Each structure stands twice: as C-alpha cells, then as structure tokens.
From Swiss-Prot:
Pathway: Carbohydrate degradation; glycolysis; pyruvate from D-glyceraldehyde 3-phosphate: step 4/5. Mg(2+) binds at residues 253, 294, 320. Signal peptide: none annotated. GO terms for molecular function: magnesium ion binding; phosphopyruvate hydratase activity. CDD domains: enolase. Disulfide bonds: none annotated. Belongs to the enolase family. The keyword Cytoplasm applies. The active site is at 217 (proton donor), 345 (proton acceptor). Pfam families: Enolase_C (PF00113), Enolase_N (PF03952). It comes from Methanosarcina mazei (strain ATCC BAA-159 / DSM 3647 / Goe1 / Go1 / JCM 11833 / OCM 88) (Methanosarcina frisia). Keywords: Cytoplasm, Glycolysis, Lyase, Magnesium, Metal-binding, Secreted. It catalyses: (2R)-2-phosphoglycerate = phosphoenolpyruvate + H2O. This is Enolase.
Length: 428
C-alpha cells in the first residue's frame, strides 16, 4: 500500500508555492525544472527529453523562438507552471497526487498536453511527489510503493551506441549489457562497469582512440557498420571481463522507426521488408545471448510485433515507440499479443499517475516492465525510486558513465542500502 491517495485536508501538507525555471539538460538544450513547497517539505524535479521520439508521445512544449537556443527554449512551459498551474494548485494537499495530476490534465484540455506542455505538467507532477515524500519524511520509493517496494531492477546498460545516439553507420540504436546473474544491484553495477571499461580498452586497441568517444547516453560510438560487429565486441568484452553469457546477456534497442522508409528497413547496408527483418532478428537471437529487443519494427507495425513475439516467445520484445507509455496503445498491444514488455517513460505520457496506470496494466497482463530514462537527461533520480516502487524487472538508464546516468544508478545503490536485508535483486 503506497502513501499516495486522497488525504484529509491538513495545512501542513498544503502547497504553498510552485516555481519553475529553465535549466539545461545533458545535451545542452533547455528543459523545465520545478520546485514545490509545503510547510513541512520541498520537492524539486527536472524533466528529460528524447532524441528518437514516438509520434504519439505527449507534447514537449518549446518556444520556437529562433533567437534563443535555436528555438528550443522552454520559457512558455515555465510561464505556464508559474501562472496557470500554480494558481490552480495552491492550497491543495500535496499528498493527493492523482487529484493534482488530473486537475492539470483538465486544465490543459488536449489529448497530448500541447496547451500547457507535457514538460510543464510532468515537472510539477514529479516535484509534487517529491514534496509529499519530504513532507512525510519518507524516501520517495517508499512514498510511491509502500511496503511492497523492495525489489531492485536489473540494469540494462547502453554501452555501445548507433542510430540517432551516435555518428556511426550502425542502424540499431543501442547495444546493451544486462548483468542478470548478479546477487545484488551493487554487484550488478560492478559487473556492468567492469565490462564497460573492458569494452573501451578493446575498442581503442582495435579501432583507435576516437572509438571511445561516447554518445548521448554514455555508450561508446565506434565507427562500425554492421550489427554483428557490435555484438561481437560485446561478447568479447563480457568474456574478457571474466563473465559468462548466463551471467550477462545482451539487449538491443533497434528504434526501427528511425531506419524505416517506404515500407522497408535500411539496416547493415540492406533494404529489408518486415518478414526479412523478422528473420534477421531470429538469426541474431540464435547467434548471440540476446535477452531483449526493443522497438524491432516501425511504431505502428503492431502485427509485425505480434509475429516476432510469437516467433521469439522466450525473448523479451519491448514496446517503446509502439506504446509510448499510453494505456490505450498498450491495451491494443495486449489484445493482439504484440510485444511482451513495456518501456515506461514518464515524459512520454506526462504525469506520474498516468505512468503508474500504464505500469499497472502491463503487470496485470504479464508484461515485463522496464523503467527508462531519455537520451537528454538531468541529474534527477525520480525514475530510480519509481522502478523500485512498481517492482520493475529492469531499468534502462544508459552506460555506467556520465553524471546524469550514474546519478540514477547511484540512487539505486542508496535504496538497496536503505532496504537492507529485505532488498531483493530481480531474477530474470
């Protein structure tokens, strides 16, 4: 039982002030940060942004002023928080998360939060949750999840980048390692970091120093042309670091919408139709220790997701752009058997309450839940607490490098320490 819910009015928990500001994210672009104050507590949250985004995501409001940040400023969203949203939320009980989220959604009056901006609404939603937890003097993961929050997710670490996250010829966007054989999250993080460092040395020796330049999420971005070349490098690094394929598996984020054009997929120098791409994935899974494939097809190709899920029934097929953390799209996927896992991104849907709804629907229907960052991040660690609170099987938050990525991993270390002997590392 979590602490979120309709609470009796108490002056100690009333929202006194909400203040938003424009800050920079990890790509050097503006984003929204929000502070929420009560007599007993304070919450601060900042909003991430994606590079490869689903068409059906909630709208991130940008100023479109070419004289500031190339049109990417967020002063309009900031103003919406400081005027419209603050006016409506002042005096409300900060513990009433759903009431507050629904009020903001009603204020916006659009399906995709395009009036106030999903970045404005989400910033307030996360800061409200943090202020509530602080006011109650309990950790955020405990506020979200109550006594059921005790599991630590398996990290799926993006250690080699392609696609929109890098400047090489790899079509597949992310090649990830998953230390699923660890006993604790602490051990999993150590395994991931050791493989990451080993991979870096291997790439430098084989491809030169420039191959260890990193992409948006901290993964290396060497000049590679084919997926098998990247997979061979990962297998080598896993073995060289002293681990086995049963201890550490591989995850792929194809982000296939990005290389889909006129009913064909451009990958590894080839132009493949959907059935050919399905065979390509099957061959990869049969050749490498691949546990998961994210967005293997175009974001509207529900039937192709269904076909691959049936073909690779013991592989985790993840819907990201397919579902965009939206319960209507997820419901369609569940009905069809399209994918068997949900990538949960709070900024795709735009509020904490709606993210919880999507996670709940996925879990009820036997889907794996993977909580995820975005390519443009901040030092905010809300998703770490969220992953523990909902019992997510995995968390995807980049390489064990770059401060905005390690912030999330380090927060999970603190949570595991705080939980003590009751902490349980997920076994996949």
């Amino acid at each position: 039982m979590s602490y979120i819910g309709l609470q009796q009015d108490s002056g100690e928990y009333k929202i006194q002030k909400i203040h938003a500001r424009e800050i920079l994210d990890s790509r050097g672009n503006p984003t929204v940060e929000v502070d929420v104050f009560t007599p007993k507590g304070f919450g601060r949250a900042s909003v991430p942004s994606g590079a490869s985004t689903g068409t059906n995501e909630a709208l991130e409001l940008r100023d479109a002023d070419p004289n500031r940040y190339g049109g990417k400023g967020v002063l309009t969203a900031v103003k919406n928080v400081n005027t419209i949203i603050q006016k409506e939320l002042l005096g409300l009980d900060v513990r009433n998360q759903r009431e507050i989220d629904e009020l903001m959604i009603e204020l916006d009056e659009t399906e995709n939060k395009s009036n106030l901006g999903a970045n404005a609404i989400l910033g307030v939603s996360m800061a409200v949750a943090k202020a509530a937890a602080d006011s109650l003097n309990i950790p955020l993961y405990r506020y979200f999840g109550g006594s059921n929050a005790f599991t630590l997710p398996v990290p799926t670490m993006n250690v080699l980048n392609g696609g929109k996250h890098a400047g090489n010829e790899l079509a597949i966007q992310e090649f990830m390692i998953q230390p699923k054989g660890a006993e604790t999250f602490y051990e999993a993080l150590q395994i991931g970091a050791e493989i990451y460092q080993t991979l870096g040395k291997f790439l430098e020796n084989k491809y030169g120093r420039s191959s260890t330049n990193v992409g948006y999420e901290g993964g290396y971005a060497p000049k590679m042309g084919e997926s098998t070349e990247a997979l061979d490098a990962l297998v080598h690094a896993i073995e060289e670091a002293g681990y086995t394929e049963s201890e550490v598996t591989i995850g792929l984020d194809a982000a296939a919408t990005e290389f889909y054009e006129e009913e064909f997929y451009n990958i590894d120098g080839k132009k493949l139709a959907a059935p050919e791409l399905l065979d390509y994935y099957v061959e990869l899974v049969n050749s490498y220790p691949i546990l998961s494939i994210e967005d293997p097809f175009y974001e509207e190709a529900f039937e192709d997701f269904e076909a691959l899920t049936n073909e690779l029934w013991d592989t985790i097929i993840v819907g990201d752009d397919l579902f965009v953390t939206n319960i209507e799209r997820l419901s369609k996927g569940v009905d069809m058997g399209a994918a068997n896992a949900l990538l949960l991104k709070v900024n795709q849907i735009g509020s904490i309450s709606e993210a919880f709804d999507a996670a709940s629907m996925a879990s009820r229907n036997g889907y794996t839940v993977i909580v995820s960052h975005r390519s443009a991040e901040t030092e905010d660690t809300t998703i770490s607490d969220l992953a523990v609170a909902i019992g997510a099987e995995m968390i995807k938050t980049g390489a064990p490098a770059r401060g905005e990525r390690t912030a999330k991993y380090n927060q999970l270390l603190r949570i595991e320490e705080d939980l003590g002997e009751v902490a349980h590392y997920v076994q996949l």
